[in-house]
């Protein structure tokens, strides 16, 4: 295998990071809806914490995407 083939395999593996971020965000908001359904009075506090968690999970996916683009175009 040459170096170009290995670069594209690495980019394909970076998709796992983006897949994990998508699963994390969906899990966060699924849990948020369940928690708000159980305790509507705490909705504001729960929503704030969920958005912070979703932002952190999404950042991992964006870092993975940036690294994949660096691998492709370098």
Swiss-Prot record:
<keyword id="KW-0138">CF(0)</keyword>
<dbReference type="Pfam" id="PF00137">
    <property type="entry name" value="ATP-synt_C"/>
</dbReference>
<dbReference type="InterPro" id="IPR035921">
    <property type="entry name" value="F/V-ATP_Csub_sf"/>
</dbReference>
<dbReference type="InterPro" id="IPR038662">
    <property type="entry name" value="ATP_synth_F0_csu_sf"/>
</dbReference>
<comment type="similarity">
    <text>Belongs to the ATPase C chain family.</text>
</comment>
<comment type="subunit">
    <text>F-type ATPases have 2 components, F(1) - the catalytic core - and F(0) - the membrane proton channel. F(1) has five subunits: alpha(3), beta(3), gamma(1), delta(1), epsilon(1). F(0) has three main subunits: a(1), b(2) and c(10-14). The alpha and beta chains form an alternating ring which encloses part of the gamma chain. F(1) is attached to F(0) by a central stalk formed by the gamma and epsilon chains, while a peripheral stalk is formed by the delta and b chains.</text>
</comment>
<protein>
    <recommendedName>
        <fullName>ATP synthase subunit c</fullName>
    </recommendedName>
</protein>
<dbReference type="GO" id="GO:0033177">
    <property type="term" value="C:proton-transporting two-sector ATPase complex, proton-transporting domain"/>
</dbReference>
<feature type="site" description="Reversibly protonated during proton transport">
    <location>
        <position position="58"/>
    </location>
</feature>
<keyword id="KW-0446">Lipid-binding</keyword>
<keyword id="KW-1003">Cell membrane</keyword>
<dbReference type="InterPro" id="IPR000454">
    <property type="entry name" value="ATP_synth_F0_csu"/>
</dbReference>
<comment type="function">
    <text>Key component of the F(0) channel; it plays a direct role in translocation across the membrane. A homomeric c-ring of between 10-14 subunits forms the central stalk rotor element with the F(1) delta and epsilon subunits.</text>
</comment>
<feature type="transmembrane region" description="Helical">
    <location>
        <begin position="52"/>
        <end position="72"/>
    </location>
</feature>
<dbReference type="GO" id="GO:0045259">
    <property type="term" value="C:proton-transporting ATP synthase complex"/>
</dbReference>
<keyword id="KW-0406">Ion transport</keyword>
<dbReference type="InterPro" id="IPR020537">
    <property type="entry name" value="ATP_synth_F0_csu_DDCD_BS"/>
</dbReference>
<keyword id="KW-0813">Transport</keyword>
<dbReference type="GO" id="GO:0046933">
    <property type="term" value="F:proton-transporting ATP synthase activity, rotational mechanism"/>
</dbReference>
<keyword id="KW-0812">Transmembrane</keyword>
<feature type="transmembrane region" description="Helical">
    <location>
        <begin position="8"/>
        <end position="28"/>
    </location>
</feature>
<dbReference type="GO" id="GO:0005886">
    <property type="term" value="C:plasma membrane"/>
</dbReference>
<dbReference type="GO" id="GO:0008289">
    <property type="term" value="F:lipid binding"/>
</dbReference>
<keyword id="KW-0066">ATP synthesis</keyword>
<comment type="function">
    <text>F(1)F(0) ATP synthase produces ATP from ADP in the presence of a proton or sodium gradient. F-type ATPases consist of two structural domains, F(1) containing the extramembraneous catalytic core and F(0) containing the membrane proton channel, linked together by a central stalk and a peripheral stalk. During catalysis, ATP synthesis in the catalytic domain of F(1) is coupled via a rotary mechanism of the central stalk subunits to proton translocation.</text>
</comment>
<dbReference type="InterPro" id="IPR002379">
    <property type="entry name" value="ATPase_proteolipid_c-like_dom"/>
</dbReference>
<keyword id="KW-0997">Cell inner membrane</keyword>
<keyword id="KW-0375">Hydrogen ion transport</keyword>
<keyword id="KW-1133">Transmembrane helix</keyword>
<keyword id="KW-0472">Membrane</keyword>
